[in-house]
Amino acid sequence: MNETFSVTDLSSDQDPAVPHGSHSAPLPSSEDLAKYAMTSPLEIGQHLKRIISANVLVTVFSNHGKSFILTKLLAIDLKSGRFAFDAGSSDDANRQLLKSERNVFVCTPDGIKTQFVTGPVQSFIYDGAPAFLARLPPEVVKLQRREYFRIQTPIANPVVCRVHDYPNPDGSAGIVLPIYDISLGGMSLVLPGEIPGMELGKIFRDCSIDLRQVGSLPVEIEVRNKLVMQQKNGHEQRRIGCQFVNQNSRVQNQLQRYIAQLERERRTLLD
C-alpha cells in the first residue's frame, strides 16, 4: 500500500488540532512515562508504519473514554504530518469520534504496548471506503513492561474482588465486584451501575481478590480511570481501572502464578 495519500477530498481544509498535555488512561497516570516516549517525528512515523505492516487492531477511545472503535492504521504522510485509519463498524461510535476533542489510540504490536493521543479527526474516503484522518501525535509511548500486559479473566466462572471498606449508601460496608482483566500492576473491575464512592484517586486499603486455585490475596487498590463500554447486546458496561498499591512480593508472586495459569489455559484452548 502506498504510504502517501490525497487529502483533497476532506470536508474541511482545516487541520485537526494537536492536543497538549501528557497522556492519561488507559495507562496509569501516576507512572512517569517520559522515558518511554518517542518525540521525534521520524521515529514516530517509523513506529506507526510498523503498526501498519503488522496489520494489528487499534482501539481508539473517544468522548472521554465513553466510546471506542476498533480500527487499523492505513497510511502515513510524513510530509503533511497526517495519518489515516479505518472507520469503525458502529455508526454511532464513529459520530462520537468525530465530535471528540481528544482521542487515545492503544494497540500492542509484537507485545509492545503503544499509546498515543490525537486531537479531533476528520472523515474522508480512502481507497473508496470511509476512513478518518488525524494529525500525527506529538509523542508516542511504548511499553514492554510485563505489569501492563493484562489478561482477561474467565467469563463463565468470573473471579471477584471484595472491597471490604467500600461505604455503601445504606451505611453498611463492602462490595463484591467481578474482575474483567488483571495484570501484575492492576485490574479492571466491573461495576453494577453508576455507583458513588468510586472517584478517581480513591484508595481502598482493605480488599481481597479470589483467584480460585491460587487462593485469596489481600490487596490495596487505587481507582485510576473509568470506562463505559458498549457490549454486543447493546447494553453499557461500566468498569474502573485500578492500580495495586503497596504490593508485597508474596502477592506479586501469586499474581504472576495466576496470570501464567490463565495464559497456559488460553494457549490450550487455541491449540
From Swiss-Prot:
Q: Where in the cell is it found?
A: Bacterial flagellum basal body
Region Disordered, annotated ranges: 1-29
Q: Which domain of life is it from?
A: Bacteria
Entry keyword Magnesium: no
List, as start-end ranges, the regions of compositional bias called Polar residues: 1-14
- Ranges for the PilZ domain? 144-260
Q: Record's Gene Ontology CC terms? A: bacterial-type flagellum basal body
Give the family this protein belongs to, as stated in its UniProt record.
Answer: Belongs to the YcgR family.
Quaternary structure and interacting proteins, as annotated: Monomer. Interacts with the flagellar basal bodies.
Q: What does this protein do?
A: Acts as a flagellar brake, regulating swimming and swarming in a bis-(3'-5') cyclic diguanylic acid (c-di-GMP)-dependent manner. Binds 1 c-di-GMP dimer per subunit. Increasing levels of c-di-GMP lead to decreased motility.
The name of this protein is Flagellar brake protein YcgR
* Species of origin: Laribacter hongkongensis (strain HLHK9)
